[in-house]
């Protein structure tokens, strides 16, 4: 049985701080240090506040006036552009954006959107004949260059270069573009322009395919006669000339088909009388000037 004055195990431990000075000093040192009043910052590190003036009505009105002036200027420019577009449309002028070839646009060419659907196939074949002429003249330059290297002389090479430089842009400007515009606008005068220069194109292709010995023994063109003449001395160059002869023959056949189809369309649409009327009106206008 426990005694009356036995200690209670659940009582808190009573410590006398005066009984041991060292323990009292440690207790004093364990108290938290007071906060430094200089370090207290109630702005959370954002610095002092800056007073912003609330009277911005003058600046707002100025900005509003500037916006209104810019809007009026844009409206004026839009009206001016619209007037120019209407004037161009009344004059019948079509603004053409260069879009071909895609990697370096130099001409406007859009058969799908500008040529009537029943004429697109014919226009595409005419376009292929233009590309065929480019191929023929390019191969002609290659073949004549080979002949020049083998000792045929530099004059035929210069002639081949002249054929290419004059033939490609000349064909586009003189007969392909007039046909394109004739199909697009149904102009009889454009058809007449096409027929005149396309016949010259066919004549040149026939001359090149034959290559008669008229100018510098005919070796500036890869025709059949020049191919026969060259193949006896230089077999490889002769093969080049025979390939060029085949290209010119194919170009001639395609061109004959194109002009036949265009002429059938021209006659079927009654463009002969219309072309005569347009020519007469043009001559009358030139006389009155």
Swiss-Prot record:
It comes from the Eukaryota. One of its GO terms (biological process) is protein transport. This is Secretory carrier-associated membrane protein. It is a multi-pass membrane protein. It comes from Pisum sativum. Belongs to the SCAMP family. It is found in: Cell membrane; Cytoplasmic vesicle, Secretory vesicle membrane. The lineage of its organism: Eukaryota, Viridiplantae, Streptophyta, Embryophyta, Tracheophyta. Probably involved in membrane trafficking. The keyword Acyltransferase does not apply. Residues 1-65 are annotated as: Disordered. The chain crosses the membrane at residues 124-144, 156-176, 191-211, 239-259. Signal peptide: none annotated. The keyword Iron-sulfur does not apply. Keywords: Cell membrane, Coiled coil, Cytoplasmic vesicle, Membrane, Transmembrane, Transmembrane helix, Transport. Induction: Up-regulated in early interactions with pathogenic fingi and down-regulated at late stages of mycorrhiza. GO terms for cellular component: plasma membrane; recycling endosome membrane; trans-Golgi network membrane; transport vesicle membrane. Residues 16-31 have a biased composition (Polar residues). Residues 59-98 form a coiled coil.
């Amino acid at each position: 049985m426990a005694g009356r004055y036995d200690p209670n195990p659940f009582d808190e431990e009573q410590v006398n701080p005066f009984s041991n000075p060292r323990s009292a000093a440690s207790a004093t040192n364990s108290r938290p240090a007071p906060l430094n009043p200089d370090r207290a910052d109630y702005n959370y590190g954002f610095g002092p506040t800056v007073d912003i003036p609330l009277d911005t009505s003058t600046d707002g009105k100025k900005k509003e006036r500037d916006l209104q002036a810019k809007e009026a200027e844009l409206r004026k420019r839009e009206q001016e552009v619209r007037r120019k577009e209407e004037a161009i449309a009344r004059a019948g002028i079509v603004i053409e954006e260069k879009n071909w070839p895609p990697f370096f646009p130099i001409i406007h060419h859009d058969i799908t959107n500008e040529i009537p659907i029943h004429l697109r196939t014919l226009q595409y074949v005419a376009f292929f004949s233009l590309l065929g002429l480019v191929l023929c003249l390019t191969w002609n330059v290659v073949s004549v260059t080979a002949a020049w290297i083998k000792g045929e002389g530099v004059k035929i090479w210069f002639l081949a270069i002249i054929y290419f430089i004059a033939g490609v842009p000349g064909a586009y400007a003189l007969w392909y573009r007039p046909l394109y515009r004739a199909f697009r606008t149904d102009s009889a005068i454009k058809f007449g322009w096409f027929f005149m220069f396309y016949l010259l194109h066919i004549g040149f292709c026939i001359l090149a395919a034959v290559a008669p010995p008229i100018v510098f023994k005919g070796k500036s063109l890869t025709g059949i006669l020049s191919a026969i003449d060259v193949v006896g001395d230089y077999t490889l160059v002769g093969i080049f000339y025979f390939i060029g002869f085949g290209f010119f023959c194919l170009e001639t056949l395609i061109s004959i088909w194109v002009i036949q189809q265009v002429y059938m369309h021209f006659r079927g649409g009654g463009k002969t009388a219309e072309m005569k009327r347009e020519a007469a009106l043009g001559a009358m206008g030139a006389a009155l000037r």
